[in-house]
């Protein structure tokens, strides 16, 4: 079991097995100065699968405690987690899409140089403005990616919609 330690809104490990197995082979997290950092979404996913253990000091954190930490920082954490888990379970590599104005950037199986999709997580009952949608599609188009809206319903089901420009 690979041990990670809580550090603010993420977790880290200096274990080389973590870096080799999780980062180099499965594309989780980011390596900075010899440490592998995972987001709380990534940590929750790996804890749920029994791949890692997260500690706060010496105390082991449960999956529910990690989820609660995420919820305290992000009101969309549960919806994002459902989408993250669904995409990972389908074999995609999922990374933060923050610099592209989306929740995730998604790569086909493996990690190519450029992601193919930007994913925006939207709870089913959210009110969306046309300007929000237009802005996100423009950014995706500008960086040559496909914009995907991941709609999460009250039953925790995820439906994906591709949103794109149509030229007449």
From Swiss-Prot:
InterPro entries: tRNA_endonuc-like_dom_sf, tRNA_intron_Endo_cat-like_sf, tRNA_intron_Endonuc_cat-like, tRNA_intron_Endonuc_N, tRNA_intron_Endonuc_N_sf, tRNA_splic, tRNA_splic_arch_short. It comes from the Archaea. Keywords: Lyase, tRNA processing. GO terms for molecular function: endonuclease activity; lyase activity; nucleic acid binding; tRNA-intron endonuclease activity. GO terms for cellular component: cytoplasm. The keyword Glycoprotein does not apply. Its EC number is 4.6.1.16. It catalyses: pretRNA = a 3'-half-tRNA molecule with a 5'-OH end + a 5'-half-tRNA molecule with a 2',3'-cyclic phosphate end + an intron with a 2',3'-cyclic phosphate and a 5'-hydroxyl terminus. The active site is at residues 107, 114, 145. It is an enzyme of class 4 (lyase). Homotetramer; although the tetramer contains four active sites, only two participate in the cleavage. Therefore, it should be considered as a dimer of dimers. Belongs to the tRNA-intron endonuclease family. Archaeal short subfamily. NCBIfam families: endA. Endonuclease that removes tRNA introns. Cleaves pre-tRNA at the 5'- and 3'-splice sites to release the intron. The products are an intron and two tRNA half-molecules bearing 2',3' cyclic phosphate and 5'-OH termini. Recognizes a pseudosymmetric substrate in which 2 bulged loops of 3 bases are separated by a stem of 4 bp. PANTHER family: TRNA-SPLICING ENDONUCLEASE SUBUNIT SEN2. This is tRNA-splicing endonuclease. It comes from Thermococcus kodakarensis (strain ATCC BAA-918 / JCM 12380 / KOD1).
